[in-house]
């Protein structure tokens, strides 16, 4: 009753009144227990299972057509559903069912301009959070997702199409992205087209381009061509594919070919003598403009314009990839790359599996990740990364045995996997991969079992440096002769090292960091094959076990590692003239026990992804 304190009843222990159960009523704050009564403990609880289980039950209700309050009519298909689920997932349906539209009161709603199967897949996603995008459905799924404003599915479709990019289909994907306002996909397809123009211009899609799209492409300063002759030849091939229809469009298109950049011989002998060019006044004017530019160098400052601007040169450089490893107590699948030209670390596509202790090397400009440990299991699977498409593929044959802490290198067109451990024992097994046959073959085993071994190739030989035999770190080194299929012992290092970094620099093998019996190491040494001797090199600034070592654009770089306390995301660059290591930061992840590889890429390639 308003204005009066509430009564509260509390249980009295048996024996207080001679009754088993009774009540004692008090007046006061209903949220406060009487003195002497302990306050209850609190235990907040959040269920991880609840959302999934709830969705599963609601989906069962849908399948049994129970509690459904709307039927979507798509073509000849009727799809039973719940308005609240559709509204929660799709702004399109939320506007439809919560506004004043007629559909908000209808039990059957007709949805037009959408594929039946695509709608089924999207409704399934609303109830299950799962969908499979594939080549057979992406072209109907993306427009449907756009209509229903399902941003997540739009992104998934665009990501799928990015992975399918090829010189034969990039123009179609570009047009598809433009139609459906997928800006990121359009940007990627544009970059891909520009970089691969020499192959794209030979495709059927190129010949079918409308004039406005052709102009968009050839107008780009980023077009990857050896000379402007290729652009002219591409335009003339396009015109002659359908001469009668396209001849009137030639002057408009030719304006975007940079004729002043052609050689005089090609301009006069090929362009000026072409019958289609000669027969059109506007085309002849463009040729005359180019001739004047070439013949009157003193007038060139007054003649500058889009047609005289050189296309940006395609620069080549090496890019460093850091793959997998151990971070924050777990194996990781992430991959990042370092471009020395921009001094930037950027994330790229992750591997399909988490891998620490992974062996990494580059064969035919493709990055291979071999074996490793995913945090619970030892792996024999292999993945391959293509930097041109930013994709990992798992269609590489597995090694014959599971391996982590394995050394991997390329010699004579083969990928070698050396040593490691399989979860039972330390290995001396060596096998090599033939990319043409997609097959691994055993070769001669090392004389010593080695995990955490570093490998390098120099002078046609494969070197296995240090590691551990399963009991203690090693300073021994073996060299494999592929002609003899034999391993030979050579001079040992000055320091025992496992999980070290190794690379060939200035015709010598450098071994850095790692761990000995007691601690992580910052020391470094190098091997001279001419004298069969190891000699000390100035130590790095940081101790680094699980360090990666690579040569990038002529610079020796030590990447990541563990200093005994902290996982590192720094790199050090060796300066042989000053005999010092210079420390740099910038990696996205602190990493231990991953792999590194170096791929030569054009400037354009390195900026597509």
UniProtKB/Swiss-Prot annotation:
Keywords: Actin-binding, Cell projection, Cytoplasm, Golgi apparatus, Kelch repeat, Nucleus, Protein transport, Repeat, Transport, Ubl conjugation pathway
Gene Ontology MF annotations: actin binding; type II interferon binding
SMART domains membership: BACK, BTB, Kelch
Pathway(s) where this gene product acts: Protein modification; protein ubiquitination
Alphabetized SUPFAM superfamilies for the sequence: Kelch motif, POZ domain
Gene3D superfamilies from the UniProt entry: 1.25.40.420, Kelch-type beta propeller (2.120.10.80), Potassium Channel Kv1.1, Chain A (3.30.710.10)
GO cellular component: axon; Cul3-RING ubiquitin ligase complex; cytoplasm; cytosol; dendrite; perinuclear region of cytoplasm; PML body; trans-Golgi network
Repeat positions for Kelch: 319-365, 367-413, 414-460, 462-507, 509-554, 556-601
Keyword Protein transport: yes
Biological process, per Gene Ontology: Golgi to endosome transport; negative regulation of apoptotic process; proteasome-mediated ubiquitin-dependent protein catabolic process; protein K33-linked ubiquitination; protein transport; protein ubiquitination
Localization per Swiss-Prot or TrEMBL: Cytoplasm, Perinuclear region; Nucleus; Golgi apparatus, trans-Golgi network; Cell projection, Axon
InterPro entries found in the cross-reference section: BACK, BTB-kelch_protein, BTB/POZ_dom, Kelch-typ_b-propeller, Kelch_1, SKP1/BTB/POZ_sf
Annotated ranges, domain BTB: 68-135
Principal location listed in the UniProt entry: cytoplasm
UniProt domain BACK: residue ranges: 170-272
Membrane in keyword set: no
Role noted for this protein: Substrate-specific adapter of a BCR (BTB-CUL3-RBX1) E3 ubiquitin-protein ligase complex involved in interferon response and anterograde Golgi to endosome transport. The BCR(KLHL20) E3 ubiquitin ligase complex mediates the ubiquitination of DAPK1, leading to its degradation by the proteasome, thereby acting as a negative regulator of apoptosis. The BCR(KLHL20) E3 ubiquitin ligase complex also specifically mediates 'Lys-33'-linked ubiquitination.
Subunit structure: Component of the BCR(KLHL20) E3 ubiquitin ligase complex, at least composed of CUL3, KLHL20 and RBX1. Interacts with PDZ-RhoGEF/ARHGEF11, DAPK1, PML and CORO7. Interacts with F-actin. Interacts with IFN-gamma (IFNG). Interacts (via kelch repeats) with IVNS1ABP (via kelch repeats); this interaction blocks the assembly of CUL3-KLHL20 complex.
Name of the featured protein: Kelch-like protein 20
Organism of origin: Pongo abelii (Sumatran orangutan)
């Amino acid at each position: 009753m308003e204005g009066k304190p509430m009564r509260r009843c509390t249980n009295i222990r048996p024996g207080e009144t001679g009754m088993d159960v009774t009540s004692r009523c008090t007046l006061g704050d209903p949220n406060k227990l009487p003195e002497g009564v302990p306050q209850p403990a609190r235990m907040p609880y959040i269920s991880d299972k609840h959302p999934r289980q709830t969705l599963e039950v609601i989906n069962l209700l849908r399948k049994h057509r129970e509690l459904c309050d709307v039927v979507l009519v798509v073509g000849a298909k009727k799809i039973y559903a719940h308005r609240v689920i559709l509204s929660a997932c799709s702004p399109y349906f939320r506007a439809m069912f919560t506004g004043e539209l007629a559909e908000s009161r209808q039990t059957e709603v007709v949805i037009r301009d959408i594929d039946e199967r695509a709608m089924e897949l999207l409704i399934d996603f609303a109830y299950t959070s799962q969908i499979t995008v594939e080549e057979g459905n992406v072209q109907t799924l993306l427009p449907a997702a756009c209509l229903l404003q399902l941003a997540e599915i739009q992104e998934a479709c665009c990501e799928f199409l990015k992975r399918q990019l090829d010189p034969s289909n990039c123009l179609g994907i570009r047009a598809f992205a433009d139609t459906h306002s997928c800006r990121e996909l359009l940007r990627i397809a544009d970059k891909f087209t520009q970089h691969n123009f020499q192959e794209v211009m030979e495709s059927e899609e190129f010949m079918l381009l409308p004039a406005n799209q052709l102009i968009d492409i050839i107008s780009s300063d980023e077009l990857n061509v050896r000379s402007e002759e290729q652009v002219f030849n591409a335009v003339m091939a396009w015109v002659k594919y359908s001469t009668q229809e396209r001849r009137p469009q030639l002057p408009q298109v030719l304006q975007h070919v940079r004729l002043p950049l052609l050689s005089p011989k090609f301009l006069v002998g090929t362009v000026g003598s072409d019958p289609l060019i000669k027969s059109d006044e506007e085309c002849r004017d463009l040729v005359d403009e180019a001739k004047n530019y070439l013949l009157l160098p003193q007038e060139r400052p007054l003649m500058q314009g889009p047609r005289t601007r050189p296309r940006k040169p395609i620069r080549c450089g090496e890019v460093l990839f850091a793959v997998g490893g151990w971070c924050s107590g777990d194996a990781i699948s992430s991959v990042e790359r370092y471009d020395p030209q921009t001094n930037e670390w950027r994330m790229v596509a992750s591997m399909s599996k988490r891998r620490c202790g992974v062996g990494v090397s580059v064969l035919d400009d493709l990055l291979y990740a071999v074996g490793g440990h995913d945090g619970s299991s030892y792996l024999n699977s292999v993945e391959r990364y293509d930097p041109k498409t930013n994709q990992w593929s798992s269609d590489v044959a597995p090694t014959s045995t599971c391996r982590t802490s394995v050394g991997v290198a390329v010699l004579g067109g083969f990928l070698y996997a050396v040593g490691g451990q399989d979860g039972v024992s330390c290995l001396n097994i060596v096998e090599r991969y033939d990319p043409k046959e997609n097959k691994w073959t055993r070769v001669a085993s090392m004389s010593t079992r080695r995990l955490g071994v570093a490998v390098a190739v120099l002078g046609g030989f494969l070197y296995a440096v240090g590691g551990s035999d399963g009991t203690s770190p090693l300073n021994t080194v073996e060299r494999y002769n592929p002609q003899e299929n034999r391993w030979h012992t050579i001079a040992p290092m000055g320091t025992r090292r496992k999980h070290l970094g190794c690379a060939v620099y200035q015709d010598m093998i450098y071994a850095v960091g790692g761990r000995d019996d007691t601690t992580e190491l910052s020391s470094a040494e190098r091997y001279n094959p001419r004298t069969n001797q190891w000699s000390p090199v100035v130590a790095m600034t940081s101790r680094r076990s699980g360090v990666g070592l690579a040569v990038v654009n002529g610079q020796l770089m030590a990447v990541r590692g563990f200093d005994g306390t902290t996982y590192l995301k720094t790199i050090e660059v060796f300066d042989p003239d000053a005999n010092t290591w210079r420390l740099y930061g910038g990696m996205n992840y602190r990493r231990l026990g991953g792999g590194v590889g170096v791929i030569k890429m054009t400037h354009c390639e390195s900026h597509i992804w």
